[in-house]
From Swiss-Prot:
The keyword Transmembrane applies. It comes from the Bacteria. The lineage of its organism: Bacteria, Bacillati, Bacillota, Bacilli, Bacillales. It comes from Staphylococcus haemolyticus (strain JCSC1435). It is a multi-pass membrane protein. InterPro entries: DUF423. It is found in: Cell membrane. Keywords: Cell membrane, Membrane, Transmembrane, Transmembrane helix. Pfam families: DUF423 (PF04241). GO terms for cellular component: plasma membrane. This is UPF0382 membrane protein SH2409. Belongs to the UPF0382 family.
Length: 122
């Protein structure tokens, strides 16, 4: 599905931008702890953006389960990386409670991709 390729490309593009912003714009402004949080958000956004691109490439040849995998990964980026970006910038710790929701969405998305592979790929 072309949409997942676009969403994946946007996620990876934004992770390059947020990574550069963290390295140059936030240097010296955040503690080491919160810089680490920022970097984790950047890395997970990149990994799952690449996953979305892969899902976009293969989604036309498999089932609707692959589309579910794509949406779950995308929502995972929003919840996981989004909450970590906001946490790093605001240091409002309660936002860290949202992060595991994103992690669960990532796991569910990868699991859905595994299931669709077993189900529809010979």
């Amino acid at each position: 599905m072309k949409l997942f390729i676009i969403l994946g490309a946007l996620c990876t593009m934004m992770s390059v931008g947020t990574g550069a912003f963290g390295a140059h714009g936030l240097e010296g402004k955040l503690s080491d702890k919160y810089m680490s949080v920022w970097e984790k958000a950047v890395n997970y956004q990149m990994y799952h953006g690449l996953g979305l691109i892969i899902i976009g490439v293969i989604s036309g040849t498999t089932s609707i389960n692959v589309n579910w995998a794509g949406w779950l990964l995308f929502l995972g980026v929003v919840f996981f990386s989004g909450s970590l970006y906001i946490l790093a910038l605001t240091q409002i710790r309660i936002l860290g409670a949202i992060t595991p929701i994103g992690g669960l969405l990532f796991i569910a998305g990868w699991l859905m991709l595994i299931i669709s592979t077993f189900k529809f790929v010979g």
